[in-house]
Design a protein with these regions (language model features):
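Catalytic beta/alpha-barrel core
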Residues: 71-73, 87-101, 110-123, 134-145, ...
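N-terminal amphipathic alpha-helix/helix-capping segment at the start of soluble metabolic enzymes
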Residues: 1-21, 79, 270-273
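C-terminal alpha-helical cap/extension of soluble enzyme domains
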Residues: 54, 208-273
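Structural preference for beta-strand elements that scaffold enzyme active sites
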Residues: 18-22, 51-55, 91-93, 110-111, ...
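Catalytic alpha/beta core domains of metabolic enzymes, predominantly
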Residues: 132-238
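Alpha-helix-loop-beta-strand connector modules within alpha/beta enzyme cores
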Residues: 39-48, 67-93, 128-134, 184-194, ...
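N-terminal small/glycine-rich loop or linker at the start of catalytic domains
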Residues: 10-28, 57-67, 193-208
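Glycine-rich, proline-tolerant flexible connector loops at the mouths of alpha/beta enzymes
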Residues: 22-34, 52-74, 239-249
């Protein structure tokens, strides 16, 4: 299959000559927090001369424990993201979990993200597609890379070809994932635009009993491997203080380390392009 044309989301091109980055905290911990993170990441990316889409979740709907923090809700979250995108002049993305959420988020959000566990939910895919927005589908931990063809066929049948896939690891026994770099090759070979999610790929699902743990120290290494293997962009969740993060702290990259990781990833992309 011929390679898809670049997917343009605001000023960011996924599948173009420059690598795209999707960056931001796991969850909106508060309005002040998400604004602070957006501004700081924007400054870092401007200095590094990289193109990025700002990501933050308004609801973590699949938390391991009922006691875990989930977020601030779809309406408030989308209002905040819309304002960030408008005022800071950057495209924004967030994940949607139901057809109704897709419809609501589609009014404000540049790119809708389909969670990995929901990647085959036809009604959700239809609702997201019918917004006309770009769609980033997280490949389920249970799917082979060639199985994304069925998801692509659904989205195209629903009238939307503005989508990409994100590799975020494959189930590897209990409480563990493995990042198979061959997946990037096979999905791109099939003609799809492909992002690599470095931080979720190092998760240990349920590894802390009532929450997910992970090996965040490995996320930059996997990002470098993915860029060298060949992908259209890198997804990384970052936090100003991962130890105190309200969700996915063990996997997020410290904000202070983001500049050096971006420099390295840009250099690798230049070397293999």
């Amino acid at each position: 299959m011929a390679k898809s044309k670049p997917l343009q989301i605001g000023k960011v091109s996924i599948g173009g000559k420059r690598p795209a980055f999707i960056l931001g905290p796991c969850v909106m911990e508060s309005e002040k927090f998400v604004w602070r993170m957006a501004k700081r990441i924007a400054e870092i990316c401007a200095t590094a001369d990289v193109d990025f889409i700002f990501k933050a979740s308004y609801d973590k709907a699949n938390r391991t424990s009922v006691r875990s923090f989930r977020g601030i809700g779809v309406r408030e979250g989308c209002d905040i993201l819309s304002a960030i995108g408008r005022d800071l002049k950057m495209p924004v993305t967030t994940d949607v979990h139901s057809p109704k959420e897709a419809e609501l988020a589609g009014e404000w959000i540049n790119m809708l993200q389909i969670p990995a566990f929901l990647c085959r939910q036809t009604d959700l895919l239809r609702a997201a597609a019918e917004t006309g927005r770009a769609i980033n589908v997280k490949k389920g931990q249970f799917l082979a890379p060639w199985d994304v063809r069925n998801i692509a066929e659904k989205l195209i049948a629903f009238g939307n070809s503005k989508f990409c896939f994100t590799e975020r690891g494959t189930t590897f026994g209990y409480n563990n994932l493995v990042a198979d770099m061959r997946s990037l090759y096979w999905m791109r070979e099939a003609g799809y635009r492909v992002i690599f999610d470095a931080t979720h790929s190092v998760q240990r699902p349920g590894g802390a009993g009532d929450s997910t743990s992970g090996d965040g120290v490995l996320a930059p290494a996997l990002a470098r491997a993915a860029m060298a293997t060949g992908c259209d962009g890198i997804f990384m969740e970052v936090h100003e203080n991962p130890v105190r993060a309200l969700s996915d702290g063990p996997n997020q990259i410290p904000l202070k380390d983001l500049p050096k990781h971006l420099r390295m990833l840009k250099a690798i992309h230049a070397a293999v392009s």
